[in-house]
Amino acid sequence: NYEILFLQGGASLQFSMVPLNLMSPKNKADYISTGSWSKKAIKEAKRVGTVNVAATTEEGEGENKFFKRIPKQGELKLDPDAAYVHFTSNNTIYGTQWMSEPEVGNVPLVCDASSDILHKPIDVSKYALIYAGAQKNIGPSGVVLVIIRKDMLERSLDSLHTMLNYKIQVENNSMYNTPNTF
């Protein structure tokens, strides 16, 4: 039911690839802001479509902004018509971590699991897409693991640039271009 990809660009490129591939056809998505990585993902997603920040736990003013907690389920202002809900499972910079996935109803759930992949069990069946930068728990920096539910591949538009298209990456076994060799 899932495809596994090893791609280039690390988790940071996924901040763009996720909305480019999954925002269609609704052109809007929910993001939960809990740290530096989710803020970067939000910034990139806004280049593609409408982003609803379903919750943020950012506190402070100016350069003294920080995150010290994960939002409670009741704080989430989710849009039932969103293309997906994105969250970062473990925010290492601020030391906050989700103990369980947010409840999102029937909206596909997307997770940046860079700090949690291979660290704890993850029930993949709860997700439409999981991505994880390799440098924390898997391998060399610049590589990213993407686990994508097969039905989500149909959202990738044919007009999307080849290297950014999950469907093309699956069709080419993650090797549309030459992968790193050592």
Predicted region positions:
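Short beta-strand segments
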Residues: 7-8, 32, 54-55, 86-89, ...
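A glycine- and small-aliphatic-rich helix-loop capping segment at beta-alpha/alpha-beta transitions
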Residues: 20-26, 48, 124-128, 151
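Conserved active-site segment immediately N-terminal to the catalytic lysine
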Residues: 110, 124-135, 144
